From Swiss-Prot:
Role: Allows the formation of correctly charged Gln-tRNA(Gln) through the transamidation of misacylated Glu-tRNA(Gln) in organisms which lack glutaminyl-tRNA synthetase. The reaction takes place in the presence of glutamine and ATP through an activated gamma-phospho-Glu-tRNA(Gln).
Reactions catalysed according to its record: L-glutamyl-tRNA(Gln) + L-glutamine + ATP + H2O = L-glutaminyl-tRNA(Gln) + L-glutamate + ADP + phosphate + H(+)
Any single Gene Ontology cellular-component annotation: glutamyl-tRNA(Gln) amidotransferase complex
Protein origin, superkingdom: Bacteria
Protein name as catalogued: Glutamyl-tRNA(Gln) amidotransferase subunit A
GO biological process: translation
Record-stated family: Belongs to the amidase family. GatA subfamily.
The keyword Ligase is annotated on this UniProt entry: yes
UniProt KW keywords: ATP-binding, Ligase, Nucleotide-binding, Protein biosynthesis
Cleaved signal peptide residues: none
This protein's encoding gene: gatA
UniProt enzyme class: ligase
Length: 489
């Protein structure tokens, strides 16, 4: 079962070849067997998932309509709210926080017959690139347990890579879906800003955050986008576009397409990732695409711009976690001021505190003009550079990360960790759609990813091109040795 795609699983269920209960139990068994080593899940909804599955079985037997995701288990990043369930955001601060309402994307998933199987680990409040900043547990990469799965959606990527769930949802503020997808050898898609509702997503950087799907292949990713990509009246930033057909509209060729490559921005890329990326570029040429050199040199400022704007938004968003309205209240506090101070001191981890301090600093009266407002101006220039690039090409190609997955604990310097996002953050600053697809392995057997970037609202074109390349790469979704079984029962 675990070797099948999500679409194949759904079709088998609809035909009556297998019950939703059997599908769900299969993945629950795999979680019980393998997740002790991987650590992808913070909570597993065993009873609730089986109840949902049995209801789907009854609907099928009664010949009632079944949704696009009928019978497919899905894992959810723990900053996306599921009503009545604990949502920790990977933080001690929210260890016992039960969501009083449902995220819009969860409503859409349930309406289409998906089975919510559990919540996945993440960097605390989505602040990190390795999932090492989770205050609750360690998550390992299924390809190499000594390595990180990437972050901040590391649990969601590890769950899919380990075949503990056919699909998962993550969130992407600066690369947090694409980077773990690259490290774990799966597909991760960051939609156009506003294409997927953020209602019920715990905010980190409100102008940057976007919920995105992870799967073993692009067709499953596109299927999930057909369900979650729609206008939501509860989200003021939601684009006024209805659901879109992806799979039925996919073309079968990229011949004649212009693919832009920002070679100047990639000049410091190490030899091995550069070689793997070059092989993908050569493949695009063989498939009839024209490779165009584009200028995105302004992206050398993207890291500074991102960490000014994202931290400024984070300091504002996390102000609500004060021990009174949300979160754990410090038992040491004797006054209202102490409740605020002690609760945050005890509840937040080091990286969250670092980013709140930086954000508060750049928003302070003496420095707002020098940092925050200047960063906003450069963000506008970055958006303009992308628009100029897309006047010359249809899509842009780049690596996802400067390197493959690194060992847990190997990067101590926060600035070095921030550089991991150098090829992904510009996309969030410009609100563009981008996908990471597996395009090879390093010499020591770690997956690496190719990033395809589209203009705003060209989500389908990005996934279409990724689908064509995926087939041409002959990269049949590889399965880590750790989680392979002799039978698919």
């Amino acid at each position: 079962m675990y070797k099948f795609s999500a679409i194949e699983i759904r079709d088998q269920f609809i035909r009556g070849d297998v019950s939703a209960s059997a599908i769900t139990q299969h993945y629950l068994n795999r979680i019980a067997k393998y997740d002790q080593k991987i650590g992808a899940f913070l909570s597993v909804y065993e009873e609730q998932a089986m109840m949902q599955a049995k209801q789907l079985d009854q609907k099928r037997l009664a010949n009632q309509p079944l949704g696009k995701l009928a019978g497919i288990p899905i894992a959810i990043k723990d900053n996306i709210l599921v009503k009545g369930e604990i949502s920790t955001c990977g933080s001690k601060f929210l260890t016992n926080f039960k969501s009083p309402y449902q995220a819009s994307v969860i409503e859409y998933l349930l309406a289409e017959g998906a089975v919510i199987i559990g919540k996945t680990n993440m960097d605390e409040f989505a602040m990190g690139s390795s999932t090492e900043n989770s205050a609750l547990q360690k998550t390992s990469n299924p390809w190499n347990l000594k390595c990180t799965p990437g972050g901040s959606s590391g649990g969601s990527a590890a769950a899919v890579a380990g075949r503990l769930s056919p699909l998962s949802l993550g969130s992407d503020t600066g690369g947090s879906v694409r980077l773990p997808a690259s490290f774990c050898g799966v597909v991760g898609f960051k939609p156009t800003y506003g294409r997927v509702s953020r209602f019920g997503l715990v905010a980190y950087g409100s102008s940057l955050d976007q919920i995105g799907p992870l799967a073993t292949n692009t067709a499953d990713t596109a299927l999930l986008m057909e369900v979650i990509g729609r206008h939501c009246p509860k989200d003021s930033t939601s684009i006024a576009l209805g659901p879109e057909d992806y799979l039925s509209q996919f073309k079968d060729s990229i011949a004649g397409m212009k693919i832009g490559v920002p070679w100047e921005f990639l000049e410091n890329l190490a030899d091995e990732p550069k070689k793997i990326f070059q092989q993908s570029v050569n493949l695009m040429k063989q498939l009839g695409a024209e490779i165009v050199d584009i200028d995105l040199s302004i992206l050398k400022y993207s890291l500074a711009v991102y960490y000014i704007l994202a931290t400024a938004e984070a300091s504002t968003n996390l102000a609500r976690f004060d021990g009174i309205r949300y979160g754990q209240r410090s038992p040491k506090a004797k006054t209202l001021e102490e409740v605020y101070d002690f609760s945050k001191e005890e509840g937040f981890g080091a990286e969250v505190k670092r980013r709140i301090l930086l954000g508060t600093y750049v928003l302070s009266a003496g420095y707002q003009d020098a940092y925050y407002k200047k960063a906003q101006k450069v963000r506008t220039l970055i958006l303009r550079s992308y628009k100029e690039a897309f006047a010359k090409c249809d899509l842009i190609a780049s690596p996802v990360s400067p390197f493959a997955a690194f060992e847990i604990g190997a990067i101590k310097d926060p600035l070095q960790m921030y550089l991991e996002d150098i090829y992904t953050i510009g996309i969030n600053l410009a609100g563009l759609p981008a996908v990471s697809i597996p395009n090879g392995f390093s010499k020591d057997g770690k997956p690496m990813g190719l990033q395809l970037i589209g203009a705003q609202k060209h989500d389908r074109e990005v996934l279409n091109a990724a689908h064509i390349l995926e087939k041409s790469l002959a990269f049949h979704p590889a399965i880590p040795e750790l989680v392979k079984e002799e039978t698919s029962a």
